[in-house]
């Protein structure tokens, strides 16, 4: 494994030298071999094993400093309070990827915290990041999970753990906010050049590299959120310090995958105002991008920044329309626009499971209404919608069998339901990782039938519907 240290070369203004502090009696309990192969990482190597686990102190490992708007309020200095960037490795695609350890121990930015993570949160992030990747959502990845015999104190004592994460970059909107509001123009310029060189090199050849890069950041963010909305994912804490400059989903905390369709659903129990509700995510994405654009007010004219931001909504809408068109087996965005509002009204009124409905729709054969109508109380309303849907689907010119096959490839049978994560966590805390691995297997292959794992596709039982997650998750 060849570990590079490009971010460290930026200097002390951007980070602090920090070593991973291994946990008491830590052990490797899950390793992502396919991701490791892509990154040319050999876990059988003793040296590599010691580097990845933090048992070997690295000369250039670091924790990053940044700022951020948290629930609308600005925090001038945040930073990696429990994370350490080990360095970067090159993937088989020739790109560099960060290796970042969560739960690595205290850093200069821990703000009186212990810098640790608990097994519960590490399992949730491992499952979510791999599930999102399988659903074609840009996301950080999970490379390795370590548990331990070290107690970490939250509301109650919990098992300490560490998660080794992989992403194209860990630079956040908040990195730019930190230097802008500190008035550190030279460092801000340095960060801009770094991002152009490492993440957006294609923009260097344009007439206005910064303008081109920011336009691409806006579009990537729009496409990412469009995918969140299409699969029913809610991030939970859409602060600017949790938004990636490379357009990846990062920092999985009190997230959730929608079960009963509820547009104003709030998955984070700590979000008392519903600021980051499911239906508000597209608007929050634009708000965060507006915060980011302010940081370049000395580089570009106001009209240029506004024009860049105006790319967001059409990019999000176009991508969302395309995704929903595929989910519904249609070929016309006009049909999507005409059918979707009425469908969402039905799903909300019936408290229909979002994922289950679209999977059932994928199996729908022309004129065979019964199995779908059995899912609802108001059969006449759904029947009227299905009749309109049939007309739209016929217009596409595809055979119904072809359309169904395409729909089954984009409508998952398996999502990460909160109660399933809870069951996997409870078992793992007792030393049994089999439920975690069974769940991980279907989440990384969510479109298959997996008849032997049918129970993992079931809707939440009553006890599972009352589970809550918060920022401590």
UniProtKB/Swiss-Prot annotation:
Q: Give the source's domain of life in one word.
A: Bacteria
Q: What is this protein called?
A: Protein nucleotidyltransferase YdiU
Question: Which residues are the active-site ones?
Answer: 241 (proton acceptor)
Could you confirm whether the keyword Kinase appears in this record? Answer: no
Keyword vocabulary terms for this entry: ATP-binding, Magnesium, Manganese, Metal-binding, Nucleotide-binding, Nucleotidyltransferase, Transferase
A molecular function annotated in GO for this UniProt entry is: ATP binding
Protein residues bound to ATP: 79, 81-82, 102, 114-115, 165, 172, 251
Q: Where does Mg(2+) bind?
A: 242, 251
For this protein, the record's InterPro entries field holds: SelO
Q: Which organism is it from?
A: Marinomonas sp. (strain MWYL1)
Question: What is the annotated role of this protein in its UniProt record?
Answer: Nucleotidyltransferase involved in the post-translational modification of proteins. It can catalyze the addition of adenosine monophosphate (AMP) or uridine monophosphate (UMP) to a protein, resulting in modifications known as AMPylation and UMPylation.
Q: What is its EC number?
A: 2.7.7.-, 2.7.7.108
Q: Which family does it belong to?
A: Belongs to the SELO family.
**Catalytic reactions on record:** L-seryl-[protein] + ATP = 3-O-(5'-adenylyl)-L-seryl-[protein] + diphosphate; L-threonyl-[protein] + ATP = 3-O-(5'-adenylyl)-L-threonyl-[protein] + diphosphate; L-tyrosyl-[protein] + ATP = O-(5'-adenylyl)-L-tyrosyl-[protein] + diphosphate; L-histidyl-[protein] + UTP = N(tele)-(5'-uridylyl)-L-histidyl-[protein] + diphosphate
Which cofactors must be present for this protein to function? Mg(2+); Mn(2+)
